[in-house]
Amino acid sequence: MAAKDVVYSDVARNELLAGVEKLADAVRVTMGPKGRNVLLQRSFGAPHITKDGVSVAKEIELKHPVENMGAQLVKEVASKTADEAGDGTTTATVLAHAVFKEGLKYITAGANPVAVKRGMDKAVEAIIAELKKMSKTVENKEQIAQVATISANNDKKIGELIAEAMDKVGKDGVITVEEGKSLQDELEVVEGMQFDRGYLSPYFVTDTEKMVAELNDAYILLYDKKISNMKDLLPLLEQMVQAGNKPLLIIAEDIEGEALATLVVNKLRGVLNVCAVKAPGFGDRRKAMLQDIAILTGGQVISEELGRTLESATLADLGQAGRVVVDKENTTIVDGRGDKAAIEARIAQIKKEIEETTSDYDREKLQERLAKLSGGVAVIKVGAATETEMKEKKDRVDDALSATKAAVEEGIVIGGGAAILKAAKNISVNVEDADEKIGVDIVKQAVKAPIKQIAKNAGFEPGIVAMKVEEADENTGFNAATGEYVDMFKAGIIDPTKVERIALQNAVSVGSLLLTTEAAVTEVPEDKPAPAAPDMGGMGGMGMM
């Protein structure tokens, strides 16, 4: 086991602070509309240019072991804030540094760290309650665009693109970000339910130019086993012909042999307008997705587990959809004729499963199912001239998207660091002793850090800006882009309440942990022996010198 080094009390805390400062100094320059870029070296390829706080934080590893521990803890604040709220990483880092630095003065002067931490926790609770009072719900597409624009470093085009995507697929819809193939940003919306299974035979296509099968006003048969025998399908097909021969989409585990051949022949002869695809997913997820399609289209899954055979299927078991489009790789069901109440109940059930699951993979798959049921999928394709620019832009779009979802979830407050500053000014906290009051004061002081940093990056005097905003009315803040004091809601400078809340909670959580640290244990690097000098033998003639 490697030897360990231990440092105590003030020495440990000061070394931790040095590490936190190094990380915070690199991250804070990106803050606000006039924030600067940071250049990150890559082990291969071109350097990465970013204005995204969490990307900068992730790159930082310090040589000094105790300093590095401090930096890693604050890096955790940035990552956790990004994971939970999608944005606010720079705010969280700046706050964590401010809490630790401010608190260290009092701890060094003899305050009790545990009592100080209690006071800090009380202050955070009070500020969050105040933020919730200040919060307004997002009412229109324009506000969504404003939130997204700010998160994308004031890129209006990205803001408008995200607002349009949200508008098209609804707040539960899935919006994904991909690297585009052109210079322009593009939005592609898939309405209805789409799954990644294409037709089983190209003979099913109805449009040979586009190579797609389009079925209008179609019936949908859902079966959870393989279909290989035609006689199982015949009773149902006969009923369909008698009922007016509507188009039919068959979704089953697989369709092969005689059954597939017969369907293809009947399709080519014009007897049936039919298309067959495999069911999406595997195992239990396949059953769940078939059930989703059944609810969306108002049909039943024919399953032997439920005592049903394919031969017993009737027209009443079939789902219906206004339009089905099947290409080589995907099937899209638009305008499913399912019962609205049943669809809502299924959506609520999936939301509950998302809350309860502990697996990230399961959560992602459940969210995909939720989106497919509740509106559709939008894909934002990011365009740029170079790969470096593409990556930087994609970072910003991802940030903006997460912040927008957070705004829809918990509402919005004024931006520019003004919301937590004003919320802290209005709080009153019951404290039990002087040290708890110190904890409250530390947080009240620390919440000025974000607005001061935004002002500093824009070239204004930080102290004066913070004081003026604190004294102004509740909606007035500082527009760092123009240098004016404005009504932030009217100017469209807004932040999601969730982002502010989570940034503050995480920052104070780690800041107070660092303050209550009394010792730091690190590994002592082993001294590796210097490599031996190479043998000089064979150098004939050297003795003549």
Curated annotation (Swiss-Prot):
Pfam families: Cpn60_TCP1. Its EC number is 5.6.1.7. One of its GO terms (molecular function) is unfolded protein binding. Keywords: ATP-binding, Chaperone, Cytoplasm, Isomerase, Nucleotide-binding. It is found in: Cytoplasm. ATP binds at residues 30-33, 51, 87-91, 416, 479-481, 495. GO terms for cellular component: cytoplasm. It catalyses: ATP + H2O + a folded polypeptide = ADP + phosphate + an unfolded polypeptide. One of its GO terms (biological process) is protein refolding. Forms a cylinder of 14 subunits composed of two heptameric rings stacked back-to-back. Interacts with the co-chaperonin GroES. Together with its co-chaperonin GroES, plays an essential role in assisting protein folding. The GroEL-GroES system forms a nano-cage that allows encapsulation of the non-native substrate proteins and provides a physical environment optimized to promote and accelerate protein folding. Belongs to the chaperonin (HSP60) family. NCBIfam families: GroEL (TIGR02348), PRK00013.1 (NF000592), PRK12849.1 (NF009487), PRK12850.1 (NF009488), PRK12851.1 (NF009489). PANTHER family: 60 KDA HEAT SHOCK PROTEIN, MITOCHONDRIAL. This is Chaperonin GroEL. It comes from Nautilia profundicola (strain ATCC BAA-1463 / DSM 18972 / AmH).
